[in-house]
């Protein structure tokens, strides 16, 4: 097993405020419109973490169901966080006819900000180097760790290790312009368009760590009834007192500060053009076109010494597409498509930046990869559909995806990035060579006159990716985060003011990581790869329409109290076990 084990408890409160305003004005040749919206999310989070690290195996004590350890480094961590996220956008456009062409020019601006600068995170530590502890994994989903010396739980023995304060403000802005024009000709409806998008992401991430000579006993220790029977969750510091340390920073000693290494700015410019023609006749429709886009990205960040690090990339993408719909009868339709798709990596993955932590000489973290390429796919789709009376619908579909540059996380046990030598794992990202996904999809929907309806869907897939490390060897893995089986079944009632839906959603297990914290990706195997176990969730949604403007809504999520389980290689090797509980909400919508 890994040499550390941790339990976490979360309390999260979220408040959301949203406002939208739209204006339409009719003119001689069409319609002018202005659309605006503003959303604000305020999160309040408490996290208690109870961690036992540096677990050393006593020779000869390991069995199929447990082991004994001769060392436990106990960390009890209390984190309090208040975060505000805002998102606003304004769009101005026109839709109408000019010179026989239908046009729709649009100019938009959006701005998002995430402010996570109001927080406090304190770790208390006790290191028992000569005390035996027992670890029982007879139930691999609920491992039990039992120290023989209970003083490891004593708040007076848990010394104040550090107070970590972070000030993270992330700003994301985008200015976009697009215009499309279409005209009906003898060969169908011809359409062409242009879009230009300029986006900037600016992350200012400051961290400062303080020390103090005190123990948890001075912070009103709290106890928690843990959900796993037989397992003790250590006392934790009062979150109000932890957050109150923000008013006492002048009395604390600064141990470490970093105002640069996590900062970065990325600017992305995308220009795209397309042409498309839609041809229809009594037996079908053919839509054919092509799209070309050019993307340039410029990033700046800092190395360990505060020197500016620059990175740039340019990428062009050509995407032809053909979509065919053929009406076999009034009720049967055959569809086929060949098209290209593109997905760009996130800015945090491509910026030349570091995010690292030094824990008494154990340096871990993550590093961006400016050489990361966008994910490209050629897609093939074929389906047969039946449209019956009312809600009756049946379909069967086949699909294939030929993928280039699929993006995977990669873990190095030791490596050096931007002058920082990591010796306790560093995560970065890497492109695979070629990947393929083949799939089959079945859909069924049927409704009765009394308002009751049934819907079901099942998708079967088979995907894999190929890697070629620097040593010239190659290996193949399952496609990441792709479940071989996925299905959902819904039973509902939709008539009059009532809209009720009971749904069950299922997926099989899938690959999450290619290697664990002790192995590099070049040594990948099933035993050191992380998987997510199969999962089924049952949800209920009920809506009642009081009037045209007012609607009541009730939601029950995860009614079966399903847990999420992650494991290394096989289900007997725990990686992570999450209990979310059931969630209920009541709300109403009013339109005016």
Annotate each predicted stretch with a short phrase.
Residues 1-54, 75, 83-93, 99, ...:
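Transmembrane beta-barrel wall of Gram-negative outer-membrane proteins
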Residues 4-6, 39-45, 159-164, 168, ...:
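Signature of Gram-negative outer-membrane beta-barrel scaffolds
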Residues 15-21, 86-92, 173-179, 269-275, ...:
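Hydrophobic, lipid-facing positions within transmembrane beta-strands of outer-membrane proteins
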Residues 27, 38-42, 86, 98, ...:
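Transmembrane beta-strands of outer-membrane beta-barrel pores
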Residues 29-32, 100-103, 187-190, 283-286, ...:
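Repeated loop/turn-to-beta-strand initiation elements of outer-membrane beta-barrel proteins
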Residues 72-87, 262-269, 342-395, 400-403, ...:
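Outer-membrane beta-barrel signature, preferentially recognizing the C-terminal barrel domain
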Residues 400-402, 414, 419-517, 555, ...:
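Gram-negative outer-membrane beta-barrel transporters
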Residues 506-522, 543-592:
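C-terminal beta-signal and adjacent terminal beta-strands/loops
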């Amino acid at each position: 097993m890994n040499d550390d084990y941790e339990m976490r408890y979360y309390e999260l409160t979220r408040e959301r405020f949203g406002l939208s305003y739209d204006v339409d004005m009719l003119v001689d040749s069409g319609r002018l419109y202005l659309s605006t919206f503003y959303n604000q999310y305020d999160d309040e989070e408490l996290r208690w973490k109870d961690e036992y690290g540096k677990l050393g195996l006593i020779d000869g004590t390991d069995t199929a169901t447990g082991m004994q350890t001769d060392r436990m480094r106990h960390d009890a961590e209390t984190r309090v966080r208040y975060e505000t996220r805002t998102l606003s956008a304004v769009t101005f456009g026109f839709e109408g006819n000019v010179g026989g062409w239908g046009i729709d020019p649009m100019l938009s601006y959006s701005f998002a900000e995430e402010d996570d600068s109001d927080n406090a995170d304190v770790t208390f530590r006790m290191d028992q180097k000569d005390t035996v502890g027992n670890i029982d994994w007879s139930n691999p989903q609920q491992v039990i760790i039992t120290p023989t010396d209970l003083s490891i739980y004593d708040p007076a023995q848990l010394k104040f290790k550090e107070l970590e304060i972070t000030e993270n403000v992330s700003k994301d802005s985008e200015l976009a312009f697009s215009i499309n024009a279409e005209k009906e000709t003898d060969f169908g409806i011809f359409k062409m368009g242009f879009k230009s998008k300029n986006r900037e992401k600016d992350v200012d991430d400051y961290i400062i760590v303080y020390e103090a000579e005190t123990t948890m006993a001075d912070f009103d220790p709290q106890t928690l009834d843990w959900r796993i029977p037989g397992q003790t969750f250590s006392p934790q510091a009062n979150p109000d007192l932890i957050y109150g340390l923000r008013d006492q920073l002048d009395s604390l000693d600064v141990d470490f500060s970093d105002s640069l290494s996590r900062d970065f700015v990325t600017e992305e410019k995308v220009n795209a053009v397309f042409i498309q023609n839609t041809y229809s006749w009594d037996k079908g429709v053919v839509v054919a076109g092509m799209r070309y886009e050019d993307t340039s990205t410029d990033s700046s960040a800092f190395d360990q010494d505060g020197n500016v690090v620059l990175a740039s990339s340019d990428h062009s993408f050509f995407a032809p597409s053909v979509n065919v719909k053929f009406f076999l009868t009034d009720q049967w339709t055959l569809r086929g498509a060949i098209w290209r798709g593109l997905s760009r990596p996130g800015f945090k993955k491509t910026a030349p930046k570091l995010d690292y932590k030094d824990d008494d000489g154990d340096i871990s973290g993550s590093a961006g990869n400016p050489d990361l390429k966008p994910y490209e796919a050629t897609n093939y789709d074929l389906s047969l559909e039946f449209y019956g009376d009312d809600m009756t619908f049946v379909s069967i579909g086949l699909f294939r995806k030929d993928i280039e540059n699929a993006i995977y996380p990669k873990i190095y046990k030791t490596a050096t990035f931007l002058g920082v030598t990591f010796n306790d794992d560093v995560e970065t990202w890497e492109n695979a060579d070629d990947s393929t996904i083949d799939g089959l999809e079945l859909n069924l929907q049927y409704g009765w006159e009394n308002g009751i309806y049934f819907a079901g869907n099942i998708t079967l897939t088979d995907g894999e990716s190929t890697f070629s490390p620097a040593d010239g060897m190659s290996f193949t893995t399952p496609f990441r985060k792709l479940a071989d089986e996925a299905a959902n079944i819904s039973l509902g009632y939709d008539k009059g003011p009532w809209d009720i839906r009971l749904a069950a959603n299922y997926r099989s297990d899938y690959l999450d990581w290619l290697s664990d914290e002790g192995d590099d990706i070049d040594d990948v195997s099933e035993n050191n790869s992380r998987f997510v176990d199969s999962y089924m969730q049952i949800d209920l949604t009920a809506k009642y329409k009081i009037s045209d403007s007012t609607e009541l809504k009730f939601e029950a999520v995860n009614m079966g109290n399903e847990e999420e389980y992650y494991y290394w290689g096989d289900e007997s090797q725990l990686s992570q076990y999450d209990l979310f509980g059931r969630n209920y909400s009541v709300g109403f919508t009013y339109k005016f």
